[in-house]
């Protein structure tokens, strides 16, 4: 008798994706982040669901409803902080996953890569609207500043901003719709993740060497299920350590002050995971130019497959490209640091130089290094 997992219409799909999936035998721990992102998403949806049961999306009660969750709801404090720090873990895994893709040439799978970029935008949108919900000072002013950027769009800008706000400023209508968006977007992310996996399973996984591994595949279960469980345990350990020992480490103290439209915080800045993009936005002294640079800083990822000039897929055997990749990582860390600093000397010039280097590395230096490596290896 054939095994039910191979014949049942639903179990067959799960089996082909997570049990009998032929997987390269040499994929490293950098390949763990995909499953960790899935775990983060499920955690965020579950904690978010329980928070939504007690939260009220109204300007007069939003802040106090979050306080109520932390003080009066059974284990509300841990649910709230797991959700807030879970977002940070989500972005850590996301950036590691993207870095892995960039380093080992996963962008050669065009469809998977492009769905990944759409997923990144969706996750960023979800995190942004979610940050507005506690209705603290940074929530309010963050929403005001970021939505206001759309007013830089010629002709329709102002109308567009007021349409998003649902009025002439960030107010009750804005909060209500942001809550609605924050509730629906994770399910859109879930659907897009399915599409991401469908495209990935069309080609099979890449591996550290970047060489076709069809002749050396092993079943996903038990080899990679056990490896993923280890990764998951380490992620849960990190999340719980952060949540239980330093829940506010990555947050902003200003968000413990209720939103006040009449008082602007000294330094308006987003959460840490958006600081690199915020630094790029601020490094251009023109509103429209800054907005375009902000968009391009992420959209540039869509150009990466077209800029892949190397004859080898992975950077594993390409020392010049490896060096530039780590320069890019250092540059992004520098931008993240600058994004959290006030707009004054020397931070302004450092931010501008780091922004120029970011675009220069991806558009010019890395493709050029690949061509030089081709020449040196007489490929």
Swiss-Prot record:
Changing residue 13 to I: In strain: Isolate NSMT-32992. InterPro entries: Cyt_b/b6_C, Cyt_b/b6_C_sf, Cyt_b/b6_N, Cytb/b6-like_sf, Cytochrome_b, Cytochrome_b_C_euk/bac, Cytochrome_b_N_euk/bac, Di-haem_cyt_TM. A ubiquinone binds at residue 201. Keywords: Electron transport, Heme, Iron, Membrane, Metal-binding, Mitochondrion, Mitochondrion inner membrane, Respiratory chain, Transmembrane, Transmembrane helix, Transport, Ubiquinone. It is a multi-pass membrane protein. It comes from the Eukaryota. The keyword Metal-binding applies. GO terms for biological process: mitochondrial electron transport, ubiquinol to cytochrome c. The chain crosses the membrane at residues 33-53, 77-98, 113-133, 178-198, 226-246, 288-308, 320-340, 347-367. It is found in: Mitochondrion inner membrane. The cytochrome bc1 complex contains 11 subunits: 3 respiratory subunits (MT-CYB, CYC1 and UQCRFS1), 2 core proteins (UQCRC1 and UQCRC2) and 6 low-molecular weight proteins (UQCRH/QCR6, UQCRB/QCR7, UQCRQ/QCR8, UQCR10/QCR9, UQCR11/QCR10 and a cleavage product of UQCRFS1). This cytochrome bc1 complex then forms a dimer. Component of the ubiquinol-cytochrome c reductase complex (complex III or cytochrome b-c1 complex) that is part of the mitochondrial respiratory chain. The b-c1 complex mediates electron transfer from ubiquinol to cytochrome c. Contributes to the generation of a proton gradient across the mitochondrial membrane that is then used for ATP synthesis. This is Cytochrome b.
